Amino acid sequence: RDSSSALMAEALDAGAEPVFYGIAPDDEQAIAELVHRAVQECDFVITSGGASAGDYDYVTALVRREGEVLFDRISMRPGKAITFGLLGGKPYLGLSGNPAAAYVGFEMLARPAIRKMRGFAEGARPVQRAVLTHGVKKRQDRRFFDRATVSRDPETGELLVTEAKTQNSALLGTMQRAVSYT
């Protein structure tokens, strides 16, 4: 899965000057070398993949060992596996390697941070009120960012939001069609 290409475009859109260091092999030393290089050359380091607890998820351990992890999980879905901390005195954000989770993590955390660092008054994308076209069960355990499409009621002009039927974060088709989160 390639989360990086889409995130590079989003970082550029947010006002950053993204630098791509390639896709690292599942090798702790190779990953450490790329992250160290990014810390030397960049003001804010964002990685995708390696932020969870799998056999090849080395990045959080690296930040914990050489910097300071401020948090390594967040109560949202998709995107629970996120690491944020300081590495070499610079902010570090480790996003999930899952494309949908990486995108949501970027939108909710990286975009506002980049825009603030660049001096923009508004950090996040604009929020608009809309009417859901169907009922949604409220969930208390975490914040859900369900992909949705938006339309306009031809009679009233109201914005209408329809959640995608499938929210599996591995399915990219719903991401391609989504223009909103509920």
Predicted regions and their residues:
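Hydrophobic alpha-helical scaffolding
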Residues: R1, Y21-A24, G49, I74, ...
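Loop/helix-junction capping segments adjacent to catalytic residues or to phosphate/diphosphate-binding pockets
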Residues: E28-Q29, A53, Y103
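Generic, well-ordered alpha-helical scaffold segments in large soluble proteins
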Residues: L34, A38-E41, L62, P112-K116
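Glycine-rich beta-strand-to-loop/alpha-helix junction loops that act as flexible
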Residues: V45-L62, V69, S96
